[in-house]
Amino acid sequence: MDAIIKSFPPRPDQTSVPAEQAGYLDKPITDRPSREEAEAAVRTLLRWAGDNPDREGLKETPARVVKAYQELFGGYDLCPAEELGRTFEEVAGYEDMVLVKDIPFHSHCEHHMVPIVGKAHVGYLPDGKVVGLSKIARVVDIFARRLQTQEAITAQIAGAIQNVLQPLGVAVMVEAEHMCMAMRGVRKQGASTLTTTFTGAFKTRPEDQARFITMVRDSRSG
């Protein structure tokens, strides 16, 4: 799972970014259609579903869907490395784990484009510097606001933090419910999926893995 990092070419306006960060700019260079073309595609889907896009209740739906997609998939226009770029070195000798638990997120599965709803737990062992806690949550949000698999988003969060902050290790746990499993196919409402990725010390020291998992689980019993 550690290798599931989707690499995209760097943004044309960011060619000066260091090579070690280029892979995390993550804005694909695509032939993005116009808003009008996107709205026309929604109209086609409405017709394919069996409805009439010209009826009163659906006349504004294509425009609303396109506007919603700009928000739901806004992560393609954001850079995780930039969010993690500002760090603090005055940590008063703190050398233990930093853990941000229960970060809620909504994403969409890349197979059926239906929602994934879950929480992420992110921990890291600082190596002389820390990052603002809100930045961890923003990194989760950036990757969540793209078409995803749970395995990929788990590894991407860990990979971005490891490569930009260079901590001693990163631990990420993601728990989520997939609507592609709840609303269609086997239709198992309430089934959840759990994925983890460990880097550095968390990968080589089982005791650190165990402590991370214990600290995450302690929030349930407290």
UniProtKB/Swiss-Prot annotation:
Catalytic activity entry: GTP + H2O = 7,8-dihydroneopterin 3'-triphosphate + formate + H(+)
| EC number annotated for this UniProt entry | 3.5.4.16
Where are the annotated segments for Disordered?
Answer: 1-36
Q: Which terms in the Gene Ontology molecular function aspect does this entry carry?
A: GTP binding; GTP cyclohydrolase I activity; zinc ion binding
Q: Which PROSITE patterns match?
A: GTP_CYCLOHYDROL_1_1, GTP_CYCLOHYDROL_1_2
Keywords, in A-Z order: GTP-binding, Hydrolase, Metal-binding, Nucleotide-binding, One-carbon metabolism, Zinc
**What metabolic or biological pathway is this protein involved in?**
Cofactor biosynthesis; 7,8-dihydroneopterin triphosphate biosynthesis; 7,8-dihydroneopterin triphosphate from GTP: step 1/1
Give any single GO term for biological process: tetrahydrobiopterin biosynthetic process
Q: Which domain of life is it from?
A: Bacteria
Gene3D superfamilies, from UniProt? 1.10.286.10, 3.30.1130.10
Q: Which residues bind Zn(2+)?
A: 109, 112, 180
Q: Which GO terms describe its cellular component?
A: cytoplasm
In terms of InterPro entries, this protein maps to:
GTP-CH-I_C/QueF (IPR043133), GTP-CH-I_N (IPR043134), GTP_CycHdrlase_I (IPR001474), GTP_CycHdrlase_I_CS (IPR018234), GTP_CycHdrlase_I_dom (IPR020602)
Member of which family? Belongs to the GTP cyclohydrolase I family.
Name of the protein this chain belongs to = GTP cyclohydrolase 1
Q: Which organism is it from?
A: Chelativorans sp. (strain BNC1)
